[in-house]
């Protein structure tokens, strides 16, 4: 089932998916912005400073405030060298309970460039997380095989973004009126945007490296996939 208004707003949802009216109202406001050709609310649509859980198509204009300060937020899935048969949840919980936050775990910057993220290797607040997982059931053998996941190993899923670096980009480019495409300012924003996406991905990797190293399983860490869900896509 979809909710449509003025041919520019679509909400993807069904009868089991309750969406706050405030979020729908915010989505309508976004759809009315100059240059917006389509605004789509996804099943996780909810209100924020701007609506969260949306995809917005624009023409000749960029709205950095719709992306917000968590540039590059996404998910990274990593395969550890911890065998499932040797995994003991109580051991991990006890060890992790000895620290209050990942910033307490010191680690060298694993990249050659200086990090613009001052607290590289931290998850952040909100709905961000790091979670150890195991494969119990495979529903798509072809895709699973293409990822070359070893079912005998523990996986680590990290949800995080560019941390304080994204805040600084937002402070500099958060024009509520938008930025015209093709301008020098648009080019400067996209340069910062792309760098934030790169370091958000690197931050997720560093979170995984920190956790596995702290727990004694740092060697053999492999990135299975890394997907960003908060960014500007050029078409």
For each feature predicted by the language model, list its residue ranges:
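Domain-length cofactor-binding catalytic modules of enzymes
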Residues: 2-25, 34-40, 47-54, 61-64, ...
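Iron-sulfur (Fe-S) cluster-binding segments and ferredoxin-like electron-carrier domains
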Residues: 78
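Long, basic N-terminal domains or extensions that often function
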Residues: 100-109
């Amino acid at each position: 089932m979809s909710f449509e208004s003025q041919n520019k707003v679509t909400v993807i949802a069904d009868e089991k998916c309750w969406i706050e009216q405030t979020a729908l109202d915010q989505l309508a406001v976004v759809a009315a912005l100059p240059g917006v050709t389509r605004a789509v609310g996804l099943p996780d649509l909810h209100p924020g400073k701007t609506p969260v859980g949306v995809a917005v198509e624009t023409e000749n204009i960029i709205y950095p405030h719709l992306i917000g300060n968590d540039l590059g937020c996404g998910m990274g899935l990593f395969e550890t060298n911890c065998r499932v048969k040797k995994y003991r949840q109580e051991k991990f919980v006890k060890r992790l309970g000895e620290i209050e936050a990942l910033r307490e775990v010191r680690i060298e910057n694993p990249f050659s460039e200086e990090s613009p993220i001052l607290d590289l290797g931290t998850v952040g607040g909100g709905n961000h997380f790091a979670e150890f997982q195991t494969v119990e059931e495979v529903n798509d053998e072809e895709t699973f095989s293409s990822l070359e996941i070893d079912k005998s190993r523990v996986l680590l899923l990290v949800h995080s973004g560019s941390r304080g670096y994204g805040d600084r980009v937002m402070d500099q480019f958060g024009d509520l009126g938008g930025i015209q495409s093709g301008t020098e300012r648009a080019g400067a924003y996209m340069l910062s945007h792309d760098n934030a996406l790169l370091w958000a991905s690197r931050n997720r990797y560093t979170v995984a490296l920190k956790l596995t190293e702290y727990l004694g399983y740092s060697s053999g860490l492999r990135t299975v996939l890394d997907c960003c869900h908060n960014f500007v896509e050029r078409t």
